[in-house]
């Protein structure tokens, strides 16, 4: 007898606690977490894990700032124009698209393609209903390609035009 995927999925979702098992009943009476496994989130997470994570984060930030402090740049000169004016780091990919486009119309078209592409993200995400990224190959591939292109354009924006294709490596 073949069991359909729908029956297996429904059975996995509607799984009930085995109240005939005395070990399970004992754990539930001691309030040992949800269903039959784990430990309660209160007070363990709030009283132990949160302070450890907060103190660890503060320690990492202080350690990095002591080991490698941010250097102070040259003083500003209001009468000298910088050699190359760059936008903030989060605008590097868009700036680089405009910089490498051969004409203004193509640059505007490429810039408008970014939000149009983002409009299609929900439709790409709904191709597959799984939550695991390894079982959603279309969405994972689109995300990885988009991330790599954005990083490539962002790094290339900081380089001169003759070196951006190879990112200055060759």
Curated annotation (Swiss-Prot):
CDD domains: cytochrome_b_C. It is found in: Cellular thylakoid membrane. Keywords: Electron transport, Membrane, Photosynthesis, Thylakoid, Transmembrane, Transmembrane helix, Transport. Pfam families: Cytochrom_B_C. Its main location: membrane. The chain crosses the membrane at residues 46-66, 105-125, 141-161. One of its GO terms (cellular component) is plasma membrane-derived thylakoid membrane. Gene3D superfamilies: plastocyanin oxidoreductase, Single helix bin. One of its GO terms (biological process) is photosynthetic electron transport chain. One of its GO terms (molecular function) is oxidoreductase activity. This is Cytochrome b6-f complex subunit 4. The gene is petD.
């Amino acid at each position: 007898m073949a069991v359909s995927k729908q029956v297996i999925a429904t059975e996995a979702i509607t799984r009930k606690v085995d109240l005939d098992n005395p070990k399970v009943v004992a754990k539930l009476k001691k309030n040992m977490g949800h269903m039959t496994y784990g430990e309660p989130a209160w007070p363990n997470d709030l009283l132990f894990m949160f302070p450890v994570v907060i103190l660890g984060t503060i320690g990492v930030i202080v350690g990095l700032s002591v080991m490698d402090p941010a250097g102070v740049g040259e003083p500003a000169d209001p009468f000298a124009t910088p050699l190359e004016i760059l936008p903030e780091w989060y605008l590097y990919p868009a700036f680089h698209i405009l910089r490498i486009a051969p004409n203004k119309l193509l640059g505007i078209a490429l810039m408008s393609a970014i939000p149009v592409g983002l409009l299609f993200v929900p439709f790409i995400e709904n191709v597959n209903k799984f939550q695991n990224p390894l079982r959603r190959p279309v969405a994972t591939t689109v995300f990885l390609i988009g991330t790599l292109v954005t990083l490539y354009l962002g790094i290339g924006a900081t380089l001169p035009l003759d070196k951006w294709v190879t990112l200055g490596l060759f």
